[in-house]
């Protein structure tokens, strides 16, 4: 569960960081 939420919330962060 934590990984799934982290993946969804981390997706825009990675795109923004890139």
Swiss-Prot record:
GO biological process: chemical synaptic transmission; response to light stimulus
Compartments where located: Secreted
Alphabetized GO MF terms: hormone activity
This protein's UniProt keywords: Amidation, Hormone, Neurotransmitter, Secreted
Modification sites for Alanine amide: 18
InterPro entries in alphabetical order: Pigment_DH (IPR009396)
Chain spans, region Important for DRPH activity: 6-9
Entry's Gene Ontology cellular component terms: extracellular region; synapse
Function: Causes the migration of the distal retinal pigment into the proximal end of the pigment chromatophore cells and thus decreases the amount of light entering the retinulas. May also function as a neurotransmitter and/or neuromodulator.
Similarity comment: family membership: Belongs to the arthropod PDH family.
Record protein name field: Pigment-dispersing hormone
Species the sequence originates in: Leptuca pugilator
Organism lineage string: Eukaryota, Metazoa, Ecdysozoa, Arthropoda, Crustacea
């Amino acid at each position: 569960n934590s990984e799934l939420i982290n993946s969804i919330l981390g997706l825009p962060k990675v795109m923004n960081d890139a």
